[in-house]
Amino acid sequence: MTRRLPLLALPLLLAACATPPQSQPPQTLYHYQLGEGTDDRPLSLAQAVDRVKDADIVLVGELHSHPAVHLLQANLLAELAEQSRQDGRGLVLSMEQFSRADQPVLDAYLAGRIGEAALIRDGHAWPNYPSDYRPLVEFAKAQQLTVIAANAPKPLVSCVGQEGPEWLDKLPASRRSQLARELTLGDDPYRQKFMASLHHGDADGNARRFAAQTSWDEPWRRAWSIISSSIPAGASCTSPATSTWRGGWVSRAASPAAIRR
């Protein structure tokens, strides 16, 4: 049976230093504080891990390039790994920072078949990889954790926005598989919220924009499906920097049909 956190239980709110819980202003950009509830009650890292220890999936949002956020991610991953060892559960790291097209390169690095320079070059690592995401990958490599490259390839997403979802039918199978098999384009609350935010453009153009956004979001749900089918029941996944538009992907992923164990 799949266990899910309440919607948006994570990302946790960031503000100041985490251990012990306190509400003092941050002293440096490397200080963070976790908070919970509408009143943002201080929460220690150990308390946060205890809150999510039974979850199948932990979502961690981020402010790109903010040192405290990336420090939190590294600390959280280490704590979750220790918790998973104690509980006998597996742990998988899913990352926005690599696209699905780069999964073979990432796998080769984790297996020791290529070096870090090749990973950065051929895996199209972001410019801030050495400072912000390397600790996650190196920890996963040392602990022999599975790492999922979860992002959609940007060129494919751009073409969907320009040509529409029908363009995907023209792709060879090897490229088409890098996006979700089907895009969720129905008139659900996510689409309504997205369309309401657009204040220009015609209906067809906006529909293509929504298809592009959905093609960006859907591979995250696909990554969860891969994880669910490839690791033992009871394992959990932590996913930093979720690629969502104002929480819409999280809403969709929380639906019962989104994840099967």
Describe these PLM feature segments.
Residues 63-67, 98-102, 153-157, 242-245:
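Solvent-exposed loop/turn segments at secondary-structure junctions
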Residues 40-41, 45-81:
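Zymogen propeptides
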Residues 91-92, 103-223, 227:
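A substrate-binding/cap region within the structured catalytic cores of diverse enzymes
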Residues 6, 19, 189-261:
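C-terminal accessory segments enriched in acidic
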Residues 6-16:
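Bacterial N-terminal signal peptides
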